[in-house]
Amino acid sequence: MHPAVFLSLPDLRCSLLLLVTWVFTPVTTEITSLDTENIDEILNNADVALVNFYADWCRFSQMLHPIFEEASDVIKEEFPNENQVVFARVDCDQHSDIAQRYRISKYPTLKLFRNGMMMKREYRGQRSVKALADYIRQQKSDPIQEIRDLAEITTLDRSKRNIIGYFEQKDSDNYRVFERVANILHDDCAFLSAFGDVSKPERYSGDNIIYKPPGHSAPDMVYLGAMTNFDVTYNWIQDKCVPLVREITFENGEELTEEGLPFLILFHMKEDTESLEIFQNEVARQLISEKGTINFLHADCDKFRHPLLHIQKTPADCPVIAIDSFRHMYVFGDFKDVLIPGKLKQFVFDLHSGKLHREFHHGPDPTDTAPGEQAQDVASSPPESSFQKLAPSEYRYTLLRDRDEL
């Protein structure tokens, strides 16, 4: 018979306190700190990684830290496998080389990675535990809608860009590559798939991928590359999903301004698809070589009345073409002139050469004066940039640099 063990009242209270603390203290997930030694290995092995690029002296970074940690705890309970979701951070003061590698221009910046590949769109939503957790849940959800009957194809939303994969089976290398691409580009296209007997009528030459452009009249396009080659498949689908001329909205304006490229914008009424098609064709014909130097965009005249007012235009004047350099706005001539070969290209070249800026301040260049006509130095005050107001706000971020005047 064992002797009874009696605890004094203070000892009993202490033991109960320790027990309660042990039971009710939540397990806090350690946020992974990234450096030059471990960053590639950790990100490459993570299905999804959300990385906080911060600086300790930044007050917005300080405010985000506890929120980021709590969101990590919430997600860790739902995705316990260490490689399913990783919450990580980079001290940009300590690791400026990493900050430069990922072009960090503001603190805090939250970037998403998939299997080591950085996604183009960073997280710009609300900085709350719920919002961050919901964002990760969305990223972990299946981006591909399975088709159970080919008749469903006839009811697709043709205002979207649709990518449809037809596969013999889901457990295949072909589908795994398709799924990987869909995870990256699901914000730009709607992805669908069909398998087995359902997809058989569309697999007469084997597994294949079809692109259905917006609109009912545009013909389908068939992918002819190797289905198991990720790079080739990704590049083909990206080319279809991310158009040369993108629409700017209030939702993506911050993202587009942060790319740092001036805007060539067509303002048009939403229902005026003819002007948009003309603009798209001329951009592709005249300016494809300028893709890395300027963003080609179109905007709804009704939604963007304020920028139009900056250039003394109203929706009644649309379609209107303009350049916003983030310092000034410059208006193209008559929209019909876009069909003159080289006219739109010269407009963009005049921006890069400084001619647009120079002529706004000092009048036409002497070379533009007609023979026998006396040159006049007519200075003007160019309208200020309107779209720079969509750039990251100093009330949400610590901004590291100002835009240079173009």
Curated annotation (Swiss-Prot):
Annotated S-S bridges? 189-241, 301-318
Protein induction: Up-regulated by inducers of the unfolded protein response (UPR), including tunicamycin and dithiothreitol.
Composition-biased stretches, type Polar residues, lie in: 377-387
The record ties this protein, via InterPro entries, to: ERP44 (IPR052643), ERp44_PDI_b (IPR041870), Thioredoxin-like_sf (IPR036249), Thioredoxin_domain (IPR013766)
GO BP terms, alphabetized: cell redox homeostasis; glycoprotein metabolic process; protein folding; response to endoplasmic reticulum stress; response to unfolded protein
Region feature (Disordered): 360-387
Classify the source by domain of life.
Answer: Eukaryota
Subcellular localization, as worded in the UniProt entry: Endoplasmic reticulum lumen
Molecular functions (GO terms): protein disulfide isomerase activity
**From the record, which residues define motif Prevents secretion from ER?**
403-406
Q: Which UniProt keywords apply?
A: Chaperone, Disulfide bond, Endoplasmic reticulum, Signal, Stress response
Residue ranges occupied by any Thioredoxin domain in the UniProt entry = 30-138
Summarizing the function annotation, the protein's role is:
Mediates thiol-dependent retention in the early secretory pathway, forming mixed disulfides with substrate proteins through its conserved CRFS motif. Inhibits the calcium channel activity of ITPR1. May have a role in the control of oxidative protein folding in the endoplasmic reticulum. Required to retain ERO1A and ERO1B in the endoplasmic reticulum.
Protein name, entry field: Endoplasmic reticulum resident protein 44
- Species this chain originates from: Homo sapiens (Human)
- Lineage summary: Eukaryota, Metazoa, Chordata, Craniata, Vertebrata
List the gene name.
ERP44
